[in-house]
Each structure stands twice: as structure tokens, then as C-alpha cells.
Amino acid sequence: MALLDVCGAPRGQRPESALPVAGSGRRSDPGHYSFSMRSPELALPRGMQPTEFFQSLGGDGERNVQIEMAHGTTTLAFKFQHGVIAAVDSRASAGSYISALRVNKVIEINPYLLGTMSGCAADCQYWERLLAKECRLYYLRNGERISVSAASKLLSNMMCQYRGMGLSMGSMICGWDKKGPGLYYVDEHGTRLSGNMFSTGSGNTYAYGVMDSGYRPNLSPEEAYDLGRRAIAYATHRDSYSGGVVNMYHMKEDGWVKVESTDVSDLLHQYREANQ
């Protein structure tokens, strides 16, 4: 197999099956959730449950220790006649502390699929990269790209299996397949919604206000860029947990392209001067 050659496995050596052999008493241990098995297993970290672990470090007065997860963001995506626009900010915060100024909150799953990040950065990055692996395996097995609907369903199924275990994720899956542009919202509870416009994160209410006032299905590409740019910029102005730069992607029929990465402070100055 090509994968064995890439991994450097000796030729002629038969790999062991990941499935347990009947009557052997041996259990598989894939180390992660895998859709390649007929009876997939969930490999949880050995030890206490994640929710109990975080509660034990919640600052109870005796330990006075608290874990602040990286969170706080504004992401948006909407469909229009020329594809899908995905725009995000770049600030990551842990509690009241700004932990990073330039975080890429768009996961490039493959040339025809994008995923946005909101919630816990570690959860979003891990599960969307795992989704990218499954999408690649689907292509190798079937000889065609996975649909946007199927990719979002895979992510939703993963979240359902880990429901109630302390995950924090709100993601939008954007892509283009045989049916045209697709946009889905998936969160840590396994919720999966299809729509024309979504926004997630702590600044989503401000972004929705701008998008609702300017969204039309027949927007031109430049009008769509300006709408996404303004929505993120004004959301970062009102939401202290959002900021940095506007990273914008355009999903087209021939794949996604990165439109721009513009500082929100410069955009707000431009808008203020234009209104004077």
C-alpha cells in the first residue's frame, strides 16, 4: 500500500488488523476516533473524566488554581451567488488576558473545504484536523471528494460521541461540491444546521447586526468582501475579546482563495474618515 511505503514499513510485512480478533480477547486501541472501523471505539484519556478534572482546578479557595481556556472570537460565513465568504478575527483570549494577537481561525481542510474556529482553540484545531484526515481517506477510498454535507455530518457525529465531556467548539464548515456552495454550523453538542448565514463567537451579535442590514443573495464579490470586512471590524470595536486582523476567504467553484488579512484598526479609521 502507498501509505505503508510512505511510513517506511518493510515490504511484504502484513499489517495487523485494527479490529479485535474474535475469541482472542484483544481490543483495538486506535488512539483516536476513527471512521475507518466497522465498530469504531472511543479512546478516552486514561484517568478521571475531563469535566471532573477541570472542576478540580476551578479555584475552590484551597488550591486557588484556575485554568483559563483560550477563547473569545468573532467568525462569520455567508452564501451568495458567487460562493461562500468566511471572515474571522485573529485575537485569542484566556479569561481577561489576550494570549495571542494573530491566530488563524480558519482551518484549511482541503482545497474545497474550510472550517472556522470558535470556542476552545485546542478543541477546534484537533477535531477539524481529524476531520481533514477523514476527508482525505474518503477521497483515497472512493476516488471523489466528500460533499460538504457529509463532511459536516462526520464532524457532528464526532461531537455527539463526546457530548457532555467538556468540549467547547462552534464551527462553520464551508465548501463547494457537486450541488454547489454549502455552509453548515456544527457545535460541541452535535448540533448541525444548514443555512445561508451564520456567525459564532462572543462578538456574533454585533456581526449579525451588520450582516442583516447588508446581506443579499445577489451580492457581487466586492460587495460581499466589504460586508464581511465591515461585520468583523465593527464586532471587534464593540467586543473586547475580538480584535487583531480580518482574515477573509472566498470559496469558489474551483476552490478557496484567501482574499485579505487587514488590520481592524486601519479599517475602523477608514470607516470613521469616510463618515465625516
UniProtKB/Swiss-Prot annotation:
Domain of life: Eukaryota
Keywords, ordered alphabetically: Cytoplasm, Differentiation, Disease variant, Host-virus interaction, Hydrolase, Immunity, Nucleus, Phosphoprotein, Protease, Proteasome, Threonine protease, Zymogen
Outcome when changing residue 201 to V: In PRAAS1; affects immunoproteasome assembly; reduced proteasome levels; reduced chymotrypsin-like activity consistent with a decrease in proteasomal activity
InterPro entries per UniProt: Ntn_hydrolases_N, Pept_T1A_subB, Proteasome_bsu_CS, Proteasome_sua/b, Proteasome_suB-type
One protein family per Pfam: Proteasome
Main location: cytoplasm
Location within or outside the cell: Cytoplasm; Nucleus
Induction of expression: Up-regulated by IFNG/IFN-gamma and IRF1 (at protein level). Up-regulated by TNF (at protein level). Up-regulated by tetrodotoxin (TTX) in glial cells. Up-regulated in Crohn's bowel disease (CD). Down-regulated by the selective inhibitor PR-957. Down-regulated in mature dendritic cells by HSV-1 infection. Up-regulated by heat shock treatment.
Involvement in disorder: Proteasome-associated autoinflammatory syndrome 1: An autosomal recessive autoinflammatory disorder characterized by early childhood onset of recurrent fever, joint stiffness and severe contractures of the hands and feet, and erythematous skin lesions with subsequent development of lipodystrophy and laboratory evidence of immune dysregulation. Accompanying features may include muscle weakness and atrophy, hepatosplenomegaly, and microcytic anemia.
Name of this protein: Proteasome subunit beta type-8
